[in-house]
Amino acid sequence: MERENYNDSINKGEFTMKTIKEILTESNGVLKLAVHNGVFHADDVLCVAMIKNKLKELGLSREVEIIRSRNPETLAQADIIMDVGGGKYDHHSSDNPMQENGVLMAACGKVADELYEGEELKMLHDYVLDSVQASDNGQKRSDLGENLFSWIRLFNTSLSESSKLSDERFAQAVEMAETVFDRQLFMIREEIADRKRIFIKVR
């Protein structure tokens, strides 16, 4: 679907857009990522953190611009829209899918499913994503993802702070989430490699 048609259908869920990986690699220009404004959670923060992580993995030095809005015209300027707008990477609808383990999908799960695969993706869901998704959808789990959800909430502006600081706080939350996610992904890959080494020895 051409960009202008995609813009026109932003709130209709009529998306045949490229995958995130295709969008990341199709240009060297500024990558515009859109999420909702106002109070943020681990879900939308993690979406941005994962994409920035993947850019580094791919060796791409694209500048990232974060757009925080609920205005359709503003969102339409973005390359990837997450957790808002009613599209491919939003989960605020009555037909939001539930995974086999009973956890409802959130934006971070939808994004991760396009960035990772196989055992790596499964372990990301088990160790981090599913608890973030559960928390964001009002379900309850308790592990690293739940802790991350709680930590990121602390970055939202308090009643005594100016709401104008919200975008700055969001960027700080993304930076923290990047650090946690990078380390978790590294440990997952180490665990997978260890399993393979053990399997080879056993054989």
What do the PLM-derived regions correspond to, one by one?
Residues 5, 20, 64, 197-199:
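Small/flexible residues
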Residues 139-203:
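Glycine-rich, Lys/Arg-enriched anion-binding loops that position phosphate/diphosphate groups
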